[in-house]
């Protein structure tokens, strides 16, 4: 319901936009959005590795990183973790992880993160290893230090409100300048799987703020693309570099949205006759998968409609596998065999057509996006030099 309301607000704002001028490439706002999905984050990690490799090839720069090209990078749950990995600075003020480092991260730490350690009356996993490895990797880095704008969602179960961590909102809400490891654990703390996360922040005036957070998917229903676009819109309105954007116009947005795969068309479907026999526990197990599959589809439908309404459909690319089956549908199967299957899913996805109406493959579309991102970066650098 919340997603539908957000879309309608965006849709009517866009229809009210009267500007018909073509966007200059250097003035476009670039957005990367990464879905949640636990260990299935391996799938978008494969896509990110390919894209970063293309950017390095186009610009002849092996040190090129995704954060150099996107104005906003947003994620929820495992997508929030990927967001942090590619935007958190190291000692040289460069992303501490290249895209090619993400899949090895899952293989090294996934089996320990998803190693049953809970109880029948509590979460499936105690989350201790996850928090420990996040602290080790992200250190004391805070939101304001991110190398580009970020949008990472969580949900506060004490205030019953979404919490969105962004750099651009810190002037108004300095309490949100939390440590990245706290944010990453919070956005990944999926109910049933991990315990909620409690932490406090302190502002410069001495005020203390308390957070009691769970998975960002509760706030964005797994797909943070609408959230990322909202943050990009605010950025466009506030950043002098985008002063030519007077109102919400998707002709001036370039959005890449990465999914973690769904099984909506194949495995784990049910009949009304089967579901009529379910009790509360059985429904609880099935409803999350149903909700995630439906929301992923509907968010893509909403955004596609909006971009098409502005004759800007080439500015939006959704990369999603809709035919997961077997163990690859599970967000917490971190066995080596399943992770290898997820790698294969990502690599195979690159060769698939973007849609049944277009012969263009995801690989070709990402190469096109890489060229646009590269050209835009060069144009903005030239403009800044004058």
UniProtKB/Swiss-Prot annotation:
Belongs to the patatin family. InterPro entries: Acyl_Trfase/lysoPLipase, PNPLA_dom. It is found in: Vacuole. Glycans are attached at residues 115, 325. Patatin have a dual role as a somatic storage protein and as an enzyme involved in host resistance. GO terms for molecular function: monoacylglycerol lipase activity; nutrient reservoir activity; phospholipase activity. A motif (GXSXG) lies at residues 75-79. GO terms for cellular component: vacuole. PROSITE patterns: PNPLA. One of its GO terms (biological process) is lipid catabolic process. The keyword Cytoplasm does not apply. Residues 32-229 form the PNPLA domain. Residues 321-384 form a coiled coil. A motif (GXGXXG) lies at residues 36-41. It comes from Solanum tuberosum. Its main location: other. It is an enzyme of class 3 (hydrolase). A motif (DGA/G) lies at residues 215-217. The active site is at residues 77, 215. The nitrogen atoms of the two glycine residues in the GGXR motif define the oxyanion hole, and stabilize the oxyanion that forms during the nucleophilic attack by the catalytic serine during substrate cleavage. Residues 1-23 form the signal peptide. This is Patatin-04/09. Tuber. Probable lipolytic acyl hydrolase (LAH), an activity which is thought to be involved in the response of tubers to pathogens. Its EC number is 3.1.1.-. Keywords: Coiled coil, Glycoprotein, Hydrolase, Lipid degradation, Lipid metabolism, Plant defense, Signal, Storage protein, Vacuole.
């Amino acid at each position: 319901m919340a997603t539908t309301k957000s879309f309608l607000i965006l849709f009517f704002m866009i229809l009210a936009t009267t500007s018909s001028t073509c966007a200059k490439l250097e003035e476009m706002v670039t957005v990367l959005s990464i879905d949640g999905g636990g260990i299935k984050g391996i799938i978008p990690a494969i896509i990110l590795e390919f894209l970063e490799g293309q950017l390095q090839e186009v610009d002849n720069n092996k040190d090129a990183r995704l954060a150099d090209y996107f104005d906003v990078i947003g994620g929820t749950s495992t997508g929030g973790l990927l967001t942090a990995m590619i935007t958190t600075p190291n000692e040289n003020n460069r992303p501490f992880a290249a895209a090619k480092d993400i899949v090895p991260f899952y293989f090294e730490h996934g089996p320990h993160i998803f190693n049953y350690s809970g109880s029948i009356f509590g979460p499936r996993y105690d989350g201790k290893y996850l928090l420990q490895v996040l602290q080790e990797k992200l250190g004391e880095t805070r939101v304001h230090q991110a190398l580009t704008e970020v949008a990472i969602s969580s949900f506060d179960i004490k205030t019953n409100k979404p919490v969105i961590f962004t750099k651009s909102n810190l002037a108004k809400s300095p309490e949100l300048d939390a440590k990245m490891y706290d944010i990453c654990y919070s956005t990944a703390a999926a109910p049933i799987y991990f315990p909620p996360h409690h932490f406090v922040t302190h502002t410069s005036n001495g005020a203390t703020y308390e957070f009691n957070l769970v998975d960002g998917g509760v706030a964005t229903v797994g797909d943070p693309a609408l959230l990322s676009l909202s943050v990009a819109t605010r950025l466009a309105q506030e950043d002098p570099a985008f002063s030519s954007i007077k109102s919400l116009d998707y002709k001036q947005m370039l959005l890449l949205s990465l999914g973690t795969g769904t099984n909506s068309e194949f495995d784990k479907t049910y009949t009304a006759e089967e579901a009529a026999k379910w009790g509360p526990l059985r429904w609880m197990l099935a409803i999350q998968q149903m909700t995630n599959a439906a929301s992923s589809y509907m968010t893509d439908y909403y955004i596609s409609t909006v971009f098409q309404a502005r004759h800007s459909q080439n500015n939006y690319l959704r990369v999603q596998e809709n035919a997961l089956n077997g163990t690859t549908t599970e967000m917490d199967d971190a066995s080596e065999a399943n992770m290898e299957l997820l790698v294969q899913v990502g690599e195979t996805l690159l060769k698939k057509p973007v849609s049944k109406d277009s012969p263009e493959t995801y690989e070709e579309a990402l190469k096109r996006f890489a060229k646009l991102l590269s050209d835009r970066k060069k144009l903005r650098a030239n403009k800044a030099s004058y």
